[in-house]
Structures are given as structure tokens and as C-alpha cells.
Swiss-Prot record:
The gene is MBF1. Residues 49-58 have a biased composition (Polar residues). Residues 96-115 bind DNA. The lineage of its organism: Eukaryota, Fungi, Dikarya, Ascomycota, Saccharomycotina. This is Multiprotein-bridging factor 1. Transcriptional coactivator that stimulates GCN4-dependent transcriptional activity by bridging the DNA-binding region of GCN4 and TBP (SPT15), thereby recruiting TBP to GCN4-bound promoters. Involved in induction of the ribosome quality control (RQC) pathway; a pathway that degrades nascent peptide chains during problematic translation. Required to prevent stalled ribosomes from frameshifting.
Length: 150
């Protein structure tokens, strides 16, 4: 037989004849069970390296809370932080409503922070620090944010 008589097929139809079974991905449990019943080779592999997934530390914290049997109280804001917010706000002659609009929050959020009822939020504390010019995190709470250099 010469080279002129054979036909070379490129593309989708190239498997016709001796192509063998194509590898399938079973998406459901039913498909997986059907493959096992028919005697096909079944391999399960975990997908790694998905790009758009990010671990959520909040979920990890909730898992730890589920593992603990006793009731764990939520973290509340320290009272001296609330007093520092109140003093700095009054020095700048701002009401709670004025301060809230300045940092794009609701007035009751400012009220909760000043009363020490709020759960600390680092982003919101940062906004308050910049608006009032007073440190509210770490040590030296209540001191000016940008102290004058000696």
C-alpha cells in the first residue's frame, strides 16, 4: 500500500477505531457509582491550586468556637478607648452624629464605641483615629496620633 492510499485524520474524529475509551470526569455520586458497577478504573483526585480561593480566618475562628463546649464571650472594646473617643470628639466640638458622618458610619456605632459595647473593628478604629487625631489602638491610647518630634 502506498502513502497515497492512507488517510490521516487530524482533530476530533482521529480516535475512530482504535482510539480506546476516553477519560471522563464523574461530577455526581451516581456517575461514580455507575462507573464502579461497569468495572471501569475509577480514580479520585483532589484539585489543588485553585486561584480564586482564599482562606477565611473568620471561619477558622468559628470552628474553634464550635470545638469549645463552654460559652465564650465576644471581645468588647475597652472602656478607656471609649473615653478617649469621647474626649477627643468633645475637644473638636463634634457631636456623635457629626463624627459619624465624617467617617461614613451611623451615629449608633459611635455611641456603641464610646459606651464600650462595640466589638472592635480595626478598620473603623483607624477611621476614628484619623478623624480625631488620637491613638485608639496599641499602647498610649488617647495620645495625639502625630506627636510633635523633639
Amino acid at each position: 500500500m502506498s502513502d497515497w492510499d492512507s488517510v490521516t485524520i487530524i482533530g476530533q474524529k482521529a480516535r475512530i477505531g482504535g482510539g480506546g475509551p476516553r477519560q471522563n470526569v464523574a461530577k455526581t455520586q451516581a456517575e461514580l457509582n455507575a462507573a464502579r458497577r461497569s468495572g471501569n478504573v475509577v480514580g479520585t483526585e483532589k484539585k489543588y491550586g485553585s486561584t480564586n480561593t482564599k482562606s477565611n480566618p473568620e471561619g477558622q475562628r468559628l470552628t474553634k468556637l464550635d470545638a469549645v463546649d463552654d460559652v465564650v464571650p465576644t471581645k468588647k472594646l475597652d472602656m478607656n478607648v471609649g473615653k478617649a473617643i469621647q474626649q477627643a470628639r468633645q475637644e473638636k466640638k463634634l457631636t456623635q452624629k457629626d463624627l459619624a458622618t465624617k467617617i461614613n458610619e451611623k451615629p449608633n456605632v459611635i455611641n456603641d464605641y464610646e459606651a464600650g459595647r462595640a466589638v472592635p473593628n480595626q478598620q473603623l478604629l483607624g477611621k476614628l483615629e484619623r478623624a480625631l487625631g488620637v491613638k485608639l489602638r496599641g499602647k498610649n491610647i488617647g495620645e495625639p496620633l502625630f506627636a510633635k518630634k523633639k
